[in-house]
């Protein structure tokens, strides 16, 4: 997981394979966003692989987490911040915009607060209890 520090320690070439994987996940992620959520943009769930798997995995608690594309786009933007390469930013802007469009389409108004929250949402680490005391993995507006 050297990509966490790659830019910071002056090894951007170690970050590039991860950045390229992110760009390669856009097309399969668009299909997943449309098929599972009827949303624009693209999504990647908790796990992927070199073959472009972007769909939810078998466990709702961790397999339904939709935040991976946003996290990956943070890396794209971090690379830009270290390089200030405008041509690079122009190339990755559609990737970042696509992830943002997905999240915009996932917003719903939470009944209790009126806040806009993502739904469905989950935490890969934690379950919660519903009103009847049952363990649940999906809800509206889950914070990580």
Predicted regions and their residues:
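Short, charged/polar micro-motifs that form catalytic or ligand-binding hotspots
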Residues: 5-9, 62, 86, 93
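Stable alpha-helical elements in mature extracytoplasmic
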Residues: 11-18, 68, 72, 92, ...
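Carboxylate/His-rich catalytic cores and anion/metal-binding grooves
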Residues: 1-41
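The feature captures the catalytic groove of carbohydrate-active enzymes
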Residues: 39-89, 104-144
């Amino acid at each position: 997981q050297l990509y966490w520090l790659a830019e910071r320690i002056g090894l951007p070439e170690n970050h590039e394979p991860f950045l390229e994987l992110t760009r390669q996940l856009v097309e399969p992620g668009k299909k997943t966003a449309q098929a599972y959520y009827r949303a624009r943009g693209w999504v990647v769930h908790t796990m992927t692989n070199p073959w472009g798997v972007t769909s939810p995995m078998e466990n709702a608690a961790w397999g339904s987490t939709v935040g991976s594309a946003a996290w990956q786009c943070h890396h794209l933007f971090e690379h830009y911040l270290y390089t200030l390469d405008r041509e690079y930013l122009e190339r990755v802007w559609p990737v970042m915009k696509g992830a943002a469009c997905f999240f915009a389409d996932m917003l719903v108004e939470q009944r209790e607060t009126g806040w806009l929250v993502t739904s469905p949402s989950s935490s890969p680490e934690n379950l919660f209890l519903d009103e009847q005391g049952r363990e649940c993995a999906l809800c509206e507006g889950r914070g990580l």
